[in-house]
Amino acid sequence: AARQTATLSRCFSEAAAPFVASNHPRRSVLYMPGSNARAMEKGKKLPADGLILDLEDAVAINMKETARKMVNEQVRKGGYGLREICIRINSLDTPWGEDDLRLVASSGCDAIALPKVERADQILKVDQIMRECGANPKTEIWSLIETPRGILNADEICGCLPRNACIIMGTSDLSKELNVHSRRALMTSLQLVILAAKKYNKVVLDGVYLDVKDLEGFEKECLEGKEFGFDGKTLIHPSTIDITNRVFAPSEQEVEDARNIIQCFHDAEKNGKGVVTYKGKLVENLHVVMAEKIMKQHELIEKI
């Protein structure tokens, strides 16, 4: 109980820190193996919003140290343009995690992804090490939630530190832990994390789709994820990037409607009208807020 109280106290004290999370679009975030130099080089030309250079699942045990050095050198070399670059380290509970973090924290990456997050104190420890290593104060932490304990502690995890800016669903590991095989069986878990992420205004990304040849099924899952409230999706193959970017971006019709709703509302305010309608539907302030969010997202996407 004492440890939990101290952890939550640290979270709330850090919440006042002047950290501003990135507003970069994260429709498509592609995992790339950190042991594959050719793949990481290819990532510089892919239309993904972000890349996760992976030191964890995608790297064999006998390649861990080599991959760590390769990723560090690759990120320091740069050349990724406006793409966000995140490095997924091994868990700090493994023999490689802390060495990963201490080497890449100051590499210039945009974020560090921490796997199998189950408690706020794991995030606090990463933050502490990043500070010790001279990481850029703007470098974010992205937390992967992929276990039952992580799901049930989602509120604590999402509420911990402004720097902990993005939540990623680890659906493959979660399916294994729950011994389930269908997307439907994960619905409660997904929605619990989405609720917690939205409560604290965090970006939340859906997990990967494993059948890379089933593009129809992939698009269906993207559409479903957007409907749930996910901001984007993590990917394992470049062939799925274009679909993801299209699904998680506002459509032309959505942009047009958003622009018109904002205009109608402001015109009504100027003319002293109390009731505003658009296409026969009542427009309230909440609709204007939603429309402004769509326009902001559209403008950010147009810049990349």
Language model segments and positions:
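Expand to "…catalyze enediolate/carbanion chemistry for C-C bond making/breaking, isomerization
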Residues: 1-304
